[in-house]
Amino acid sequence: MSFIATPQFMHFDEPLPLQSGGSIADYDLAFETYGQLNADKSNAIVVCHALNASHHVAGSYEGQPKSEGWWDNMIGPGKPVDTDKFFVIGINNLGSCFGSTGPMHTNPATGKPYGADFPVVTVEDWVDAQARLLDRLGIQTLAAVLGGSLGGMQALSWSLRYPERMRHAVVVASAPNLNAENIAFNEVARRAIVTDPDFNGGHFYEHGVVPARGLRIARMVGHITYLSDDVMNQKFGRSLRAPTLPAARGSLPPEGTDPTRGGPASDRRDYLYSTQDVEFQIESYLRYQGEKFSGYFDANTYLLITRALDYFDPARCHDGDLTRALAVAKARFLLVSFTTDWRFAPARSREIVKSLLENNRDVSYAEIDAPHGHDAFLLDDPRYMSVMRSYFEGIAKELKTTERAGGAA
């Protein structure tokens, strides 16, 4: 059973310098905490979120039993990241649409929503903002920083920007930068949004519209990259979707549809011979995912976050030499990859491992044979969960040893 989570907010009126050369004059950060901070404040873990996630990492909200956090299977009492042992902090990134200051919020200079005027933010900017929140909470050193996908990039960035403030970095299903293919996927998604007639140059709020068509397509493109070929074939194959009434064409699947499969089961064998209707179950599934996403995510946030992904490249300032870039890191590392993840393939994690080893850093690496593609980092694969549990149990033992040594002194 899930525990009750409570969102919190912290306001900052000290300008935050940005990598772009600009700044954010004042801003709010949304966050949640789970567990208890110990007496010497040494058991804190920051969890960094991926593209469409938030600070709501674990637990459920009061009276909303279906509101479980996006990594609730990983974090909580008795779970791999055990909140009976750790004080876990989930922080919503700047530019998001889930509570922290972002494009939907009012620009104090104009009295209108920022929209496209919200400054471009980077992974490094997010990490700097997170560090400021920890300062407010009185936490100087973290037991670990943990993240998957884009969150893993933030964990890696933490080890470079604040090497003295963390003991462990746990980087899951991530990469040291995006390759050209991933940048291309992001660009296709962004073009779908900015060419939507309702986008209005990013200032659609004041027009009372949402570029839903562009968001739907962006999500459909992105979702394809999160799944593996094996999973897509197993779930959908070439199965046809049951026909719908003409009035329902192009709409959400009808009531009773299983959205995880894309549409009601169909034993029909004939094609509709139409270029407009939903013919295959995979089409229905992608449309469902796009429709759902466009109902809760902000278009400007999508543009900002995908561009932050594109820009992340710690080796860039070191002539492309990742080993030189990682030389400042002092944390111990766990990296986890998944064999069928083609968005951030295992070879990308091995690049990080190799560079850390060349710097004589303490590194553990697990490559999990899982069929689920990039989304595997969110799922309950027993081998994956065992690796995570074992590593965090080791961190908990370190903390106990340190506490005993402090008490003896």
Swiss-Prot record:
Q: Where in or outside the cell is it found?
A: Cytoplasm
Q: Which SUPFAM superfamilies match?
A: alpha/beta-Hydrolases
Q: What is its EC number?
A: 2.3.1.46
Which residue intervals define the domain AB hydrolase-1 in the entry? 43-380
Please give an example of a GO cellular component term from this record: cytoplasm
Can you provide one Gene Ontology molecular function annotated for this UniProt record? Answer: homoserine O-acetyltransferase activity
Reaction(s) catalysed (UniProt annotation): L-homoserine + succinyl-CoA = O-succinyl-L-homoserine + CoA
Superkingdom assignment: Bacteria
> For the site Important for acyl-CoA specificity, which positions are given?
R343
Q: What pathway does the UniProt record associate with this protein?
A: Amino-acid biosynthesis; L-methionine biosynthesis via de novo pathway; O-succinyl-L-homoserine from L-homoserine: step 1/1
| Entry-linked InterPro entries | AB_hydrolase_1, AB_hydrolase_fold, HAT_MetX-like
Name the Gene Ontology biological process terms.
homoserine metabolic process; methionine biosynthetic process
Q: Which Pfam families match?
A: Abhydrolase_1
Which residue intervals make up region (Disordered)?
A: 244-268
Sites binding substrate sit at R219, D375
Tell me which residues this entry annotates as catalytic.
Answer: S149 (nucleophile), D341, H374
What family is reported?
Answer: Belongs to the AB hydrolase superfamily. MetX family.
Q: What does this protein do?
A: Transfers a succinyl group from succinyl-CoA to L-homoserine, forming succinyl-L-homoserine.
HAMAP family xref list: MetX_acyltransf
This protein is called what? Answer: Homoserine O-succinyltransferase
